[in-house]
Curated annotation (Swiss-Prot):
Reactions listed under catalytic activity: 2 D-alanine + ATP = D-alanyl-D-alanine + ADP + phosphate + H(+)
Organism: Streptococcus pneumoniae (strain Hungary19A-6)
Biological processes, Gene Ontology terms: cell wall organization; peptidoglycan biosynthetic process; regulation of cell shape
Pfam families in UniProt: Dala_Dala_lig_C, Dala_Dala_lig_N
Major place of residence: cytoplasm
Identification of the protein by name: D-alanine--D-alanine ligase
Residues of the ATP-grasp domain: 131-333
Enzyme Commission designation: 6.3.2.4
Reported cofactor(s): Mg(2+); Mn(2+)
The keyword Mitochondrion is assigned to this record: no
Pathway: Cell wall biogenesis; peptidoglycan biosynthesis
GO CC terms in record: cytosol
Enzyme superclass (EC): ligase
Function per UniProt: Cell wall formation.
Length: 347
């Protein structure tokens, strides 16, 4: 009997378009000799719509249904996704997707799911909290100032200008895929950047700009996590924003990255240490800055990295000899393993 994968995609965050791209790639790459895929679209308003079911590889003309094509009469209660022995693959990015919300819901339903649990998802989603956890684990971070809604913005800008130097990068604490990120060269630009970031979150991070290469490491496993050789993001733009990443196609990747064996060893060790520090499960992508001074800063952990066929995470594992279909299969097995342990601990 085939294993059922419940594919959740869309979502309420600003990254829902990325989710659709990732989910379509998963839908096409699944080994249909072993799996059946059932899909549910989550609308921007949070509604669950039962969309499609695939028992064999979809044709090139097949697309996952989205706002423009779904049948709203197929809206269901969120709990309707439940199916005994099915594994959920929540291909959801950003808030209300990889921040622990959906993970908690799936645990209430007693369903195994791909990826990190409630705690590690919520920790990694919040950039400020992640930095504090990683600092306690002895992992170097880019200097930063945290600003929370309600703070005296003028005083915080003065703190930024005292502790950091321009340029600085301003980021919503709970957002991914470079949404809401701005580069500031002076105080006026910083004020505008803060206004933009606060549109997405009530907690904002201002980081020191660094001249650095962007290096990424893939992680796979539960308590026995393994890492990939690093890959490098090669940019044709000033910085890695949302449009460059997903719309303008101005990003290329160098896999493996052309860095020394010593640097590779440090990055892989730090990535695995960070994954364990947050209690990671299943998968993550660990992003580093490697400065022109030879400094290595861990930038962030993505617990549900972009999963399209051209995304860094699956390409990193392909370089290690694990194909995209095999990667999906391994993630399903890891989901079942972590579910069994979670249920055993509750007995």
């Amino acid at each position: 009997m085939k294993q059922t994968i419940i594919l959740l995609y869309g979502g309420r965050s600003a990254e829902r378009e990325v989710s659709v791209l990732s989910a379509e790639s998963v839908m096409r790459a699944v080994n249909y000799d072993r799996f059946t895929v059932k899909t549910f679209f989550i609308s921007q308003s949070g509604d669950f719509i039962k969309t499609q079911e695939f028992s064999q590889t979809p044709g090139q003309e097949d697309r996952l249904m989205t706002n423009e094509t779904i049948d709203w009469d197929k809206k269901v209660a969120p709990s309707a996704i439940y199916e005994e022995r099915a594994v959920v693959f929540p291909v959801l990015h950003g808030p209300m997707g990889e921040d622990g919300s959906v993970q908690g819901f799936l645990e209430v339903l007693k369903m195994p799911y791909v990826g990190c649990n409630i705690l590690s998802s919520s920790l990694a989603m919040d950039k400020i909290t992640t930095k504090r956890v990683l600092e306690s684990a002895g992992i170097a971070q880019v200097p930063y100032v945290a600003i929370v809604e309600g703070d005296d913005v003028t005083a915080k800008i003065a703190e930024v200008e005292e502790e950091l130097t321009y340029p600085v990068f301003t980021k919503p604490s709970n957002m991914g895929s470079s949404v809401g990120i701005s580069k500031s060269e002076n105080q006026e630009e910083l004020r505008q950047a803060l206004k933009l970031a606060f549109q997405y979150d009530s907690r904002v991070l201002v980081e020191q700009g660094v001249n650095a290469r962007e290096i990424e490491v893939g992680l796979l496993g539960n308590y026995d996590v393994k890492s990939t050789l690093p890959g490098e993001v090669v940019k044709d733009v000033a910085f890695y924003d949302y449009d460059a990443k997903y719309i303008d196609n101005k990003i290329t990747m160098d896999i493996p990255a052309k860095i020394s064996d010593d640097v590779v060893a440090v990055m892989r060790q730090n990535a695995e240490t960070a994954f364990r520090a947050i209690g990671g499960l299943g998968l993550s992508r660990c992003d580093f800055f490697y400065t022109d001074k030879g400094e290595i800063f861990l930038n962030e952990l993505n617990t549900m990295p972009g999963f399209t066929q051209w995304s860094m995470y699956p390409l990193l594992w392909d370089n290690m000899g694990i194909t995209y279909p095999d990667l999906i299969e391994r993630l399903v097995e890891l989901a079942k393993e972590s579910f069994d342990k979670r249920e055993a601990h509750l007995l």
